[in-house]
């Protein structure tokens, strides 16, 4: 009679170990090349959505009950416009958001005003308005969920979302 296990088990185990070691030996060698225009040390290829989000910035924030762009927001949007003018293959969606206070209808309208303020600024900086669509989520998609001013501040925002690269037809 043959015993089950024994040598067969050892051979299977050795085979699995050999495969794992071979896969580890095939891993990346050397340091990855850093790309990007910021000083964050992030790894992002030029013209990639990662570069846009990390090095350029995809969020601007607003004061309570306001769709007026602050100086900081204008600075971030200026960088966005430069990047979008350089990489014209992207279309964008500007998502307008609000904090949890107020009615759903009020916050949807406020989110729409915030998204339009961003679109208008980007267009004034040379980004073709046909590449920019807007949507308001009002208070429906918060970043931070709590009943405190620190959360409300984070949720009063507009986010620029890159869509798949488009064929220039605008």
Predicted regions, residues:
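A generic structural micro-feature
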Residues: 150-154
């Amino acid at each position: 009679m043959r015993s089950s296990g024994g040598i067969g088990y050892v051979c299977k185990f050795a085979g699995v170990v050999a495969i794992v070691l071979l896969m580890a030996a095939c891993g990346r060698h050397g340091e990855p090349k850093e790309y990007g225009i910021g000083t964050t040390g992030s790894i992002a290829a030029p013209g990639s959505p990662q570069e846009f989000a990390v090095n350029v910035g995809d969020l601007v924030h607003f004061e309570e009950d306001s769709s007026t762009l602050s100086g900081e927001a204008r600075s971030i949007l200026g960088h966005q416009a430069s990047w979008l003018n350089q990489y014209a293959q992207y279309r964008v969606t500007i998502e307008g958001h609000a904090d949890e206070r107020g009615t759903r209808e009020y916050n949807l309208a406020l989110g729409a005003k915030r998204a339009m303020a961003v679109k208008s600024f980007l267009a004034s900086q040379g980004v073709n308005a046909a590449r920019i669509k807007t949507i308001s989520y009002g208070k429906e998609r918060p970043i931070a969920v709590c009943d405190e001013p620190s959360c409300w501040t984070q949720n009063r925002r507009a986010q620029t979302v890159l869509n798949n690269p488009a064929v220039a037809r605008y």
